[in-house]
A protein has these predicted regions:
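Intrinsically disordered, low-complexity, positively charged segments
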Residues: 10-38
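Conserved donor-binding loop and adjoining core beta-sheet/short helix segment
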Residues: 27-99, 216-244
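Short, glycine/charge-rich beta-strand/loop segments that flank catalytic centers
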Residues: 90-107, 119-121
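Short catalytic-loop micro-motif centered on adjacent basic/acidic residues
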Residues: 92, 158, 269-273
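Conserved active-site alpha-helix within GNAT-family acetyltransferase domains
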Residues: 100-114, 143, 277-294
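Acyltransferase donor/substrate-recognition loop-hinge adjacent to the catalytic core
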Residues: 109-189
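A mid-sequence, solvent-exposed acidic-amphipathic segment
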Residues: 162, 170-232
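Aromatic (often tryptophan-rich) hydrophobic motifs at membrane interfaces
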Residues: 210-303
């Protein structure tokens, strides 16, 4: 069997090196996501030459991601097949993009059946469109921001620092409490997968090389966002929170962070705002910004010979 290990911050350097060889725009191929979401999906990593191998044990069963890196991809997939066989499992590959599916079919013709995972598609946006909000399609977003500025004249955007992380965590807990109250429920924030992931990101913020921004109104944090580089031209927005009762707060933190990324990373062309998980409200919100690209995701299962 392949010796997979759970990721730790110490793995970031070698994992990033291999991910850079793949230069993939899907948020699944990002060390931060592999680390902070490991309790939810039980990610495990291994290295095979210049390939990163990823195994996960999520709600849909035991799976592998398509190898990321460079070299003999067919050999890497055969190694995954052997590992799955030793574990008594079918080889299931998840988060495959269309180019990866085409490559899989080239080397293993007719051996895999593939199904689309629409709920997992990533939404990519041209960074200039999110930073400038030009054009008729985004007129409503400009109106939301105008209303936010009118109603909150003391608003200020600033970069997240280690000193302000506790305030962001406190704001997230309050955001969650308000959300649950609207739904008639009360429970602790850290019981949810996202709460665990966010706490891990904040606890290892500097080790993971994360960046972020926040908005204050009368000195209080009312919105924040956290992200990092995903590929040569794409930046991943991992977390974004704003008080929903403040009209335009989400639109404002979205715009301000896009402007910050554009200024500090001029090579970035797209912002990946990740998937909608099949949640109708999230899908509507992400579609309302009219994505420039969708990173399609598929699952491929090896059929018995």
């Amino acid at each position: 069997m392949i010796e997979f290990q759970a990721p730790t911050p110490a793995d970031k350097a070698w994992v990033d090196e291999l991910l850079a060889l793949g230069n993939l725009r899907g948020c699944d191929y990002n060390f931060t996501n592999l680390f902070v979401w490991q309790k939810a999906y039980r990610f495990e990593l291994a290295r095979m030459g210049n390939f990163l191998l990823i195994r996960l044990r999520g709600r849909t069963g035991n799976s592998y991601m398509y190898p990321a890196g460079s070299g003999d991809i067919a050999a890497a997939i055969r190694a995954l097949e052997a590992d799955a066989t030793e574990r008594g499992e079918p080889l299931r590959l998840v988060c495959l993009t269309p180019p990866q599916m085409a490559e899989l079919e080239e080397f293993f013709p007719g051996r895999f059946t593939c199904t689309a995972d629409r709920d997992g598609y990533d939404y990519l946006y041209d960074i200039d469109r999110l930073a400038d909000l030009g054009g008729k399609k985004l007129h409503a977003k400009r109106n939301h921001i105008h209303r936010f500025v009118e109603n909150n004249p003391t608003w200020a955007y600033e970069e997240i620092t280690p000193a302000s992380l506790p305030e962001c965590l406190e704001m997230d807990q309050e955001w969650y409490r308000r959300s649950l109250q609207r739904e008639g429920e009360v429970e602790e924030r850290d019981l949810g997968d996202e709460g665990i992931a966010l706490r891990a990101a904040m606890e290892h913020y500097e080790e993971l090389g994360l960046e972020g921004g926040l908005i204050r109104v009368y000195g209080e944090v009312v919105a924040f966002t956290i992200g990092d580089r995903l590929s040569a031209d794409t930046y991943d927005v991992h977390f974004e929170k704003a008080y929903g009762e403040l009209q335009g707060a989400y639109a404002m933190i979205n715009r301000e962070f896009a402007r910050w990324v554009r200024e500090h990373h001029p090579e970035i062309k797209y912002l990946n705002r990740e998937d909608d998980m099949g949640v109708p409200g999230l899908r509507k919100a992400k579609e309302s910004y009219y994505p420039d690209l969708l990173v399609e995701k598929h699952t491929a299962i090896l059929q018995k010979a």
